[in-house]
């Protein structure tokens, strides 16, 4: 973030690339620092719509008027500052700075030449508008930014080669949407403890903790058994109604859950229960995937046929729960290296990992083999035991 701030102070915008939107790229620059030269650069080399972004709530409090839309765009009435035409680079820069100062709508002339867009929160929408506000704030400036979509010589807005050459030519920093999301989750506390209660179970007496969730709105929860050592024994368990509740033999989820609860009862630890049914695709789609597996596809192939990636999960909620519980260092019980990476990228230190196996049955053997071969799950040991 210090490097980002230095670039902005030198008058260099950041290029923000969204690989989930066919590599669409925007210039991003803090509105409070914008100058005539930066505006001129944006217009010359960006060529897309020139916009200033701010939080929607902030704009509404200042009286800005939202335009009607039939496709979800969050545009407000465009404005100008001052008495000139408003179109020059000098005038547009001043308009952006006045917006960043917190000036009210009635102080501007409208309609003007600076398009205003309201952000609705990065956790709700991972778009350039919302990301630009986080970038500006992370670099130490107010939550107001100027963004311009980058078009190539033919007006194409999705030319990654052109964007990267532009970055190289002018020595501009490049960020991807995932980079911003990672810093956003690492630096902000978006979940906090809401309630906790005693939970007596067949495995022992635990605490169950719920959370106020401003990250994804889902009712994730944690099971805690004290005392907690450093590093804390942690298991991230993705919801599996069929395995956890109905004791399905198609997977090993229920038996893994039971095995960790037994461990917790004896040694202490935290079970994080994430509402990520079917590796993040939901129960209905999981059942559809089961149907495809009944026809001979494996679990990865079934996901892809349904239009999903092999694993749709993000472990940001798990990292946020640990932060809400005051945990920074963990002993992670997992066979899945993606969970280790998923915690570490959000600022949780995984000191060590330990394997946690479930039950192998004739019904889940092929499924487990697929997870090992195609998803990288470390299950070789359990297959050696079964085959011996």
Swiss-Prot record:
Pathway(s) per entry: Cofactor biosynthesis; riboflavin biosynthesis; 2-hydroxy-3-oxobutyl phosphate from D-ribulose 5-phosphate: step 1/1; Cofactor biosynthesis; riboflavin biosynthesis; 5-amino-6-(D-ribitylamino)uracil from GTP: step 1/4
Single Gene Ontology BP annotation: riboflavin biosynthetic process
UniProt site positions, description: Essential for DHBP synthase activity: 113, 149
Catalytic-site annotation from UniProt: 311 (proton acceptor), 313 (nucleophile)
Binding site for Mg(2+) 2: 22, 128
InterPro entries, per database record: DHBP_synth_RibB-like_a/b_dom, DHBP_synthase_RibB, GTP_cyclohydro_II, RibA, RibA-like_sf, Riboflavin_synth_RibBA
Residue pairs linked by disulfide bridges in the UniProt entry: none
Co-factor binding details: Binds 2 divalent metal cations per subunit. Magnesium or manganese. Binds 1 zinc ion per subunit.
Swiss-Prot/TrEMBL cofactor(s): Mg(2+); Mn(2+); Zn(2+)
Regions annotated as coiled coil: none
Binding positions (Zn(2+)): 240, 251, 253
Organism superkingdom: Bacteria
GO cellular component terms given for this protein: cytosol
Binding site for D-ribulose 5-phosphate: 21-22, 26, 125-129, 149
Pfam families found in the cross-reference section: DHBP_synthase (PF00926), GTP_cyclohydro2 (PF00925)
Residue sites binding GTP per the record: 235-239, 256, 277-279, 299, 334, 339
Alphabetized GO MF terms: 3,4-dihydroxy-2-butanone-4-phosphate synthase activity; GTP binding; GTP cyclohydrolase II activity; magnesium ion binding; manganese ion binding; zinc ion binding
HAMAP family from the UniProt entry: RibA, RibBA
NCBIfam families: PRK00393.1, PRK09318.1, ribA
Function: Catalyzes the conversion of D-ribulose 5-phosphate to formate and 3,4-dihydroxy-2-butanone 4-phosphate. Catalyzes the conversion of GTP to 2,5-diamino-6-ribosylamino-4(3H)-pyrimidinone 5'-phosphate (DARP), formate and pyrophosphate.
Name under which the protein is recorded: Riboflavin biosynthesis protein RibBA
Organism: Thermotoga maritima (strain ATCC 43589 / DSM 3109 / JCM 10099 / NBRC 100826 / MSB8)
């Amino acid at each position: 973030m210090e490097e980002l701030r230095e670039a902005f102070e030198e008058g260099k915008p950041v290029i923000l690339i969204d690989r989930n939107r066919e590599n669409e790229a925007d210039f991003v620059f803090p509105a409070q620092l914008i100058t005539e030269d930066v505006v001129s650069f944006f217009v010359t080399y960006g060529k897309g719509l020139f916009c200033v972004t701010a939080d929607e709530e902030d704009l509404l409090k200042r009286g800005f008027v939202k335009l009607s839309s039939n496709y979800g765009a969050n545009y407000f009435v465009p404005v100008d500052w001052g008495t000139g035409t408003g179109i020059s680079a000098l005038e547009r820069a001043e308009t952006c700075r006045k917006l960043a100062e917190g000036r009210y709508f009635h102080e501007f002339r409208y309609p003007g030449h600076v398009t205003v867009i309201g952000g609705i929160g990065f956790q709700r929408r991972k778009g350039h508008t919302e990301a630009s506000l986080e970038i500006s704030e992370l670099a130490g400036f107010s939550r107001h930014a100027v963004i311009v979509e980058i078009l190539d010589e033919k007006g194409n807005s999705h030319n990654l080669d052109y964007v990267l050459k532009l970055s190289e030519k002018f020595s501009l920093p490049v960020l991807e949407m995932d980079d911003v999301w990672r810093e956003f989750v690492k630096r902000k506390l978006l979940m906090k403890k809401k309630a906790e209660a005693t939970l007596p179970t067949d495995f022992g007496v635990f605490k169950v903790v719920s959370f106020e969730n401003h990250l994804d709105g889902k009712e994730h929860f944690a099971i805690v058994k004290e005392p907690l050592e450093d590093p804390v024994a942690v298991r991230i368990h993705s919801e599996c109604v069929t395995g956890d509740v109905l004791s399905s033999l198609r997977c090993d989820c229920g038996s893994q859950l039971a095995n960790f609860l037994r461990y917790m009862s004896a040694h202490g630890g935290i079970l994080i229960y994430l509402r990520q049914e079917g590796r993040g695709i939901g129960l209905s789609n999981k059942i559809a995937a089961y149907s495809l597996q009944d026809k001979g596809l494996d679990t990865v192939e079934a996901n892809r046929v349904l239009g999903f990636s092999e694993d749709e999960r993000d472990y940001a909620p798990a990292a946020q729960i640990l932060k809400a519980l005051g945990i920074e260092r963990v002993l992670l019980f997992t066979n899945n290296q993606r969970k280790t990476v998923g915690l570490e990228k959000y600022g949780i230190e995984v000191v060590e990992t330990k394997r946690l196996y479930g039950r192998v049955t004739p019904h889940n053997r092929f499924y487990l083999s697929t997870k090992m071969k195609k998803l990288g799950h470390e299950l070789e040991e359990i297959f050696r035991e079964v085959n011996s």
